[in-house]
Amino acid sequence: THCLTTAAGAPVARFSTVAGERGAADAERDIRRLFSYGDAARRLGVNHQHIPVNAPR
């Protein structure tokens, strides 16, 4: 993410909106979320239940 910096060194968000109003930052995050969930599912493969950490106890 690209951030600006104030004179005090505190990061300032690139997108600032009114509280409760969805803006470009939220839309961009939603698009990334759509791709990340599918990528994670495909990374584990069809036999994900056989991976020890994913197996039921």
Swiss-Prot record:
<keyword id="KW-0349">Heme</keyword>
<protein>
    <recommendedName>
        <fullName>Catalase-1</fullName>
        <ecNumber>1.11.1.6</ecNumber>
    </recommendedName>
</protein>
<keyword id="KW-0560">Oxidoreductase</keyword>
<dbReference type="GO" id="GO:0042744">
    <property type="term" value="P:hydrogen peroxide catabolic process"/>
</dbReference>
<dbReference type="GO" id="GO:0020037">
    <property type="term" value="F:heme binding"/>
</dbReference>
<comment type="similarity">
    <text>Belongs to the catalase family.</text>
</comment>
<dbReference type="GO" id="GO:0042542">
    <property type="term" value="P:response to hydrogen peroxide"/>
</dbReference>
<keyword id="KW-0408">Iron</keyword>
<dbReference type="GO" id="GO:0004096">
    <property type="term" value="F:catalase activity"/>
</dbReference>
<feature type="binding site" description="axial binding residue">
    <location>
        <position position="37"/>
    </location>
    <ligand>
        <name>heme</name>
    </ligand>
</feature>
<dbReference type="InterPro" id="IPR020835">
    <property type="entry name" value="Catalase_sf"/>
</dbReference>
<dbReference type="GO" id="GO:0046872">
    <property type="term" value="F:metal ion binding"/>
</dbReference>
<keyword id="KW-0376">Hydrogen peroxide</keyword>
<keyword id="KW-0575">Peroxidase</keyword>
<keyword id="KW-0479">Metal-binding</keyword>
<comment type="subunit">
    <text>Homodimer.</text>
</comment>
<comment type="function">
    <text>Decomposes hydrogen peroxide into water and oxygen; serves to protect cells from the toxic effects of hydrogen peroxide.</text>
</comment>
